[in-house]
Amino acid sequence: MFRVPDDSILSSSPAPSTPDKSRRAGSSNLFRDSTASSAASTTPAGTPPVKFLGSSIMRPSDKNASSSVDDDQPAVGLFTGIGGGVGVGMGAGTGATAAAKAAKKNLFAAVSGERRRNVPLGRSGRGHDSRQPSRLRKSIGVDDLEDEEEEEEKKKKPQLLKPKGKVQEKKKDEPVRGLFTGTSLAPPPLSKAAAAATTTTTTGPTKSFGLTYEEFGESEEEDSGLTGGQDAEGELDDSMWLERSPERPAIGDESDLLLMATPAATERVRREAEDIFRATAMGAGATTRRHEYRYASLAKDVYTQLGTAPLVEPPQLILSTEALLEQLYDEGVGTHDDDARLDETLAAVAVQLINLWQDHVDAIAQPEEDGHVADIGPGPRASPFEKAYWLATLALQLHHTRALDGGVEPLPATLFQWLNDRHDMYAGQVEEILRYRPSPACHSLFWQAVFMSLLRGRVKDATQLLRRAGWEHVRRGGQQRGEYAYSDRALENVLRVVDETVSVLESCPGYDGNWEIWSSEWTLFRVRAQGALEHLRRFAEGKDTSFGDSLFGSSTGSNRGYTGYRDHTLAGLARRAESQVPWDVYESLNVVFDIVLGQQASILEAAQDWLEATIGLFGWWDERNNNNNNNNNNNNNNNGYQKPGRTQALVLHSSPAHHINNDSESYLDRLARAFHAAVASDFHFNSQNPVEIGMACIFEDNIKGVIGLLRSWSLPIAAAVAQVASLGRWLPPHRPKGMYALEDLDMDDLEVLGVDPGAPDEVDGVKDSTLVQYAQALVEYEGLETVRDRAGVYREGWELAISVLGRMDSPERSEEMVRDIVEHLVQGLTVDSTETVDRLWTMLNELSMITYAEEMTETFGDILARESHRYGEAMWYYALAHRPNKVREVMNLLISYSLIQSTAFPPAADLDDYLHRLLSDRKHTLEQYAKQDMEAAELLGKMLSGYAALRQFYDIRDNVDATSISPVSRRQQAAAALISVIASSDDNIRGGLVDQTRDGIVSEDFLLALLGEALVFVSNPDNTFVHHGHAAVPILSQDQIDVLLKAVEDLTAVSERVYNVCDEFLQLVLASAPGGALKGSKPADLLKKGQDGQQMVLAGSSLIASQLQKSLLGGSGSALGKVPVKRGWDWREGMPAKMKGEDVIRRLRLGLAKDLARLWLAEADALVW
């Protein structure tokens, strides 16, 4: 059984050095020893300023004060978090005993006689307020250069802040020169000899915080980036250099320049220039970050060999994924850049994507366990989709996890949560150990569970295990009936040290979920934890043992695992025997402190695999304290700086505390270093497992490799991650590699060099290449049209494919691929593809591919006009294609056939839905069309007005029983409709001159036939009392007569070519009368060529000619040759068989003259009466 040594033995040892031991008497806390400490903080942010220390004893005290607490108040150790007596407290240097040959320097000591100011961390270590000269301006002596060369040979990388010169013992009353202030506690001497005499150093190596962020950021006050007046070699301050000896050449002389022309001086200048460059880059906010992709080539080989995965996901998953991505573009991307809105939308959509894929993974039948539980990622029998989901989840959570309050969650918290959710080999272990009897501490995995809980960020679980351990029930050798392992004073000491350890862990910011590891809270916590560890070691190893001589003084943890470093020497065995705390508990508590203080070796020892080690290092690692021992891991340090941005969730926000070790740190850089440190250790990295390779790509920030691997498992997941990464700006934009100096190499030579200029990823970029492959698979995918999306709409594969292609980064490449899909779809269009055409048109317009939309609708309009009688639909699609000539052709077909048959065509029963709605509810229909395309609606409404007026004329004429008005009124209404059509046809030949720019609605080719229809409203020259079988009642008004007379005069004055076309169409109309000359003839026989070789109307369009031929010959259901037509009248009845155009004009002139004379007489009679 472990027993504490007798008090008499302990009392014979000399007491540790304290600033004022008498004032600490009576303290009951075993950790209230006030020995001054030399241990520096291990936090990345450096020494905390005075404003962080509140009212604690770390506030600056007067030089002569030996204690910062009252005589009546007992001193309290920093380990407990109350009051004074800390190893890092004030005044340690002046209160050291003479027996301490290696007295530690006080890191927080104030300058004598002065009150420290509350200044930022970087300035708290400076001793001068004025701007100091740059090291580039200092002259260099021969002796200095020789010393530097010797130092360079011993160690290539000099230790910052290491004093130079002979080591001297420091007397008790001698003023101490501050390590970080650059000034002594007494006024500095003026001579160089005196300065050398007063320069003191410690007898042992002194830990330092390293350079803080302010030493680079505040270039206004210090050019070199070093503290005080020291440089990298530890020279004296600038006042020494300014006192130049007579034999030393003046600064700037030739001899001075020659002295500087040495390798050592060149190396110093190079290091100085690099420091200045880094400081300048940080101040300018440079955005370049160097990456070291050690596994990029391996990942490329793997996903190239795996190829592209087939599209086998269920339709509902594909539709839901696309719906979320469309939501991302609709809500997050607007006409104006809004990083805040985009950042919020990215985070929300990322969570929804993960949940959607999780539901599908849960629905997949899981394979039976085959002993691969401890593998990283899904097992070898897992489905490809599950592997893709596992990798994509980490990538999305890494970049777009948000806290509950909407802010950016610190990345360590995100990774700890992901690790516990996705890679937890110890699920339920803490609860199992807490239920273990007789006590949790008796469990064989008790300490491992404590270490694992800390390593995984579960600080509360670790404290709960320690608090409820039940040390009083632990028996030796783990036997149930054996002797108790701890009793009496040993048990009391165990309980005390464990309670104090628990109190430290409870003060850890991670205990409350604060994982902003570069914040001031973490800085103060690690200062306190370091002090607590020192007190623990002093108490456990004996009061006469100084910290520097402690077995665990290095606190690197590199020499031990869980069982500790077995020192079998007599000194080691004696130290164990003298320990106040049982050695196994003491060793384990050291590991606990090593983990929370970020010791790399202890973290690696506690981890079970490289993934756990990577995330554990990322969350806890204090890199500066390991730099000297791990220089081989520092090759990947990035000197660039990535500018912060809201849409890049991982880049640190602009707090100066985030800049450490002469470098602008980011979480991604730290994650890459943690990963490289983990795989460089003894952990096995399975390069044959694509999932582990994908994890390596994520940790190295190689997003291209991640997407390439995802593409080998699931195209929907790969495409989604690529788009989110592109919008989130964590996928670098594609920059095609130049082929400079490679033009003369053939493909074999390029293959040897590893260059494939024709690879899709090299040509299009990994994002566009992935989207192209996904779109090609969607076009061939079957089954989507049977499932409704979230909006309740059926969507086909090609529709999703075009939507995906519209999100490519390259507009040219996107249009090229869309054109291929459109051409493929157009080849399969039929007259029943209306719904497909509407969807395709809508999508192409949303993607701003107007040209493709117009070509597609024009092609579909041709199909309708050629293979159907849906003339209204054909006109609408021509209008959508913005082809007014095509719209005019269809309208000319309808007008010509109506005039030839002298009736409305097509009949009301054969109207297609489009034409029916345009004729019956023209205003409302055009309003609906205008919502889709305003220009197309205007074009269709304008072109259709002439045909609508002509059809209205025939409807009024033929529907005798449909109206209740008198015959005279009906004839007047019919005349008004016909006159409007005649006026439109005459519009292009006003004054006998053809002017196509007037863009008349009705072609002038129909003017003679329209005038023939007007003969029924004009007095018969042969019998003025009869109007085509009706009483000679005036039908036309004077204005209408005027319109007809103008049309007659314009037609007679027009060119012969135009008149001949009109006359030939008139002959066609007369020949089409019942019993006319057209019987047995084809319409094409009547479409003769004019004298100029131009065909007359209808002949210019084979489409219209074929339609006219089919209709006239009764080749369709709309054929009027098989359906008797009931007309109100037919103007061709009673006309001579060989009637010409001149005859129509002559009859109109005579009839109109008589009607006009009758109107004048009636007007004159009205005036007389």
Curated annotation (Swiss-Prot):
Biased composition annotated in UniProt, kind: Acidic residues: 143-152
Single Gene Ontology BP annotation: protein import into nucleus
Keyword Protein transport recorded: yes
Keywords, in A-Z order: Membrane, mRNA transport, Nuclear pore complex, Nucleus, Protein transport, Translocation, Transport
Membrane topology type: Peripheral membrane protein
Chain residue ranges for the region called Disordered: 1-210
Motif (Bipartite nuclear localization signal): 103-110, 155-162
Subcellular location(s) per record: Nucleus, Nuclear pore complex; Nucleus membrane
Biased composition (Basic and acidic residues): 166-176
Residue spans of biased composition, Basic residues class: 156-165
Annotated Gly residues bias: 80-94
Key word Protein biosynthesis present: no
Subunit structure and binding partners: Component of the nuclear pore complex (NPC). NPC constitutes the exclusive means of nucleocytoplasmic transport. NPCs allow the passive diffusion of ions and small molecules and the active, nuclear transport receptor-mediated bidirectional transport of macromolecules such as proteins, RNAs, ribonucleoparticles (RNPs), and ribosomal subunits across the nuclear envelope. Due to its 8-fold rotational symmetry, all subunits are present with 8 copies or multiples thereof.
Family: Belongs to the nucleoporin Nup85 family.
Function text: Functions as a component of the nuclear pore complex (NPC). NPC components, collectively referred to as nucleoporins (NUPs), can play the role of both NPC structural components and of docking or interaction partners for transiently associated nuclear transport factors. NUP85 is involved in nuclear poly(A)+ RNA and pre-ribosome export, in GSP1 nuclear import, in NPC assembly and distribution, as well as in nuclear envelope organization.
Name assigned to this protein: Nucleoporin NUP85
Protein species of origin: Chaetomium thermophilum (strain DSM 1495 / CBS 144.50 / IMI 039719)
Gene: NUP85
